From Swiss-Prot:
GO terms for cellular component: cytosol. It comes from Rhizobium leguminosarum bv. trifolii (strain WSM2304). Belongs to the NAPRTase family. The keyword Ligase applies. The gene is pncB. Pfam families: NAPRTase, NAPRTase_N. Pathway: Cofactor biosynthesis; NAD(+) biosynthesis; nicotinate D-ribonucleotide from nicotinate: step 1/1. PANTHER family: NICOTINATE PHOSPHORIBOSYLTRANSFERASE. GO terms for biological process: NAD biosynthetic process via the salvage pathway. Keywords: Ligase, Phosphoprotein, Pyridine nucleotide biosynthesis. Signal peptide: none annotated. Catalyzes the synthesis of beta-nicotinate D-ribonucleotide from nicotinate and 5-phospho-D-ribose 1-phosphate at the expense of ATP. Its EC number is 6.3.4.21. GO terms for molecular function: nicotinate phosphoribosyltransferase activity. This is Nicotinate phosphoribosyltransferase.
């Protein structure tokens, strides 16, 4: 793939040349896996998604021009899958399985375009909402986040001259490459790019993916970004997300249905996928509650992705549960992906080496680490914690508790109700940086 002079491209920036979202598959692979399940099993459910800036001190409406934001959102709505993309999705093997996407689903997807959005301002923040059919609104999550993050980066760099931009990107490349050099010390490492949603820019994410591909070779197992996987001949990686149990819980009519919501989703997932896609995301309503009530068959799944507890504490809790269930952790897989940088990756790898199979999803600190790279400090280049979460399903409020109270989302009264129902044990309050 030809190298792009990112600094020159930024300095000579023209919007028509560089739309932020270039393709509907410039998204995370698990969005397509989940979309097929939603399309097949929940076609009539409505769900709303809402942008949430957890870094309250950053006033996004003051940093990002509303006209530019609308331009980018409107452009994303014009996109449809290309013939090349359709052929690749239909003909490629994912996770060792051919035709993972059903022909009827792909036929529907071939005509898909992103639905309308609602945008306003309140107290220095953007209020960005997506309402409608779940199988349509779900696809806004990743492009909306990528647009907001890249517009913030562009705004921060707008006044920089060509030489300053050269220095900025040269330092960022050197910083990222120094991380690659440290990862080479870990024999048997398996790591993938999870950095689409909060990336500095598409071009920077592509550079990081190419650098990992060359720098650590087979240890780099792929990217969650479907477009980059296709263009770079890499594995598209990813399993499932919190939105599935969040919607199932919101739709629950009884306490029993609420308690069983996470396990119902796993049963639904197993109807469509198997093998290495049988990865449990346990923390939507707290990992302790999930493990306490989990049916024994959950222990037969391939692995877990502990997403909001500190990685070592979260991993140990799951290993203890596997042992309690009579399973050998050495045959199981833990995927660590929450706010990781190279120090946490190395510490976690060395802690669990030989005790469990491991894989790492490297996100924001891979694709958006420009701290200390500008000749003078530019706060707009520091990543923020911004998410796009389900806010309601069929008009009923949706909640995520998480193992970290700082990551809880939903109406405060509903969050409190869920806490009383599922319990609040073993939750660890940590500052959320990304």
């Amino acid at each position: 793939m030809a190298r792009t002079d990112i600094a020159r491209r930024v300095y000579n920036h023209a919007w028509k040349l560089d739309p932020i979202i270039r393709s509907l598959i410039d998204t995370d692979f698990y969005k397509l896996l989940m979309l097929q399940m939603i399309w097949k099993l929940y076609p009539d459910v409505n769900a709303s998604f809402t942008l949430i800036n957890r870094t309250k001190r950053v006033r996004l409406a003051d940093e990002i021009d509303e006209g530019e934001l609308r331009e980018q959102l409107d452009h994303a709505r014009t996109l449809k899958l290309s013939k090349k993309e359709m052929i690749w999705l239909a003909g490629n093997s994912f996770y060792g399985r051919a035709q993972i996407f059903e022909p009827e689903f792909l036929a529907w997807l071939s005509n898909f375009q992103l639905p309308e959005y609602e945008l306003s301002k309140k107290d220095g923040q953007y209020v960005l909402d997506f309402h409608g059919s779940w199988k349509e609104t779900t696809m806004w999550e990743i492009p909306a986040l990528a647009i907001v993050n890249e517009l913030r980066s562009r705004s921060a760099m707008r006044a920089l001259g060509p030489f300053t931009l050269d220095v900025l990107y040269a330092r960022a490349k050197a910083k990222m490459w120094s991380k690659v050099e440290r990862l080479k010390e870990l024999p048997g490492l398996r790591i993938s790019d999870f950095g689409t949603r909060r990336r500095h820019s598409f071009l920077w994410q592509r550079w990081c993916v190419e650098a990992l591909k060359e720098g650590i070779g087979p240890a780099f197992t792929g990217t969650s970004n479907v477009l980059l996987a296709m263009d770079s001949d890499l594995e598209a990686v990813g399993t499932n997300a919190h939105e599935l149990p969040m919607v199932a819980a919101a739709l629950a009519q009884t306490d029993e249905q609420l308690r069983n919501a996470p396990y119902k989703i796993l049963r639904d997932w197993n109807k469509l996928y198997g093998g290495n896609l049988l990865i449990v995301l346990p923390d939507a309503f707290g990992t302790a509650a999930f493990l306490r009530d989990a049916p024994e068959w959950v222990a037969d799944w391939t692995g877990f992705r502990p997403d909001s507890a500190p990685p070592i504490e979260g991993g140990e809790k799951i290993i203890d549960w596997w042992k309690k269930m009579g399973r050998d952790p050495r045959q199981k897989l833990l995927i660590f992906s929450d706010g990781l940088d190279v120090d946490a990756i190395i510490d976690t790898y060395r802690h669990f080496e030989g005790r469990v199979r491991m894989s790492f999803g490297w996100g924001t600190n891979l694709t958006n680490d420009f701290s200390g790279c500008a000749p003078t400090e530019i706060s707009g280049l520091n990543p923020i914690s911004v998410v796009c979460k389900v806010s309601d399903a069929d008009g009923r409020p949706a909640v995520k508790l998480s193992d970290n109270p700082q990551k809880a989302t939903g109406d405060p009264a509903e969050v409190e109700r869920y806490l009383k129902f599922f319990g609040a044990e073993d939750r660890i309050d940590q500052t959320v940086l990304v």
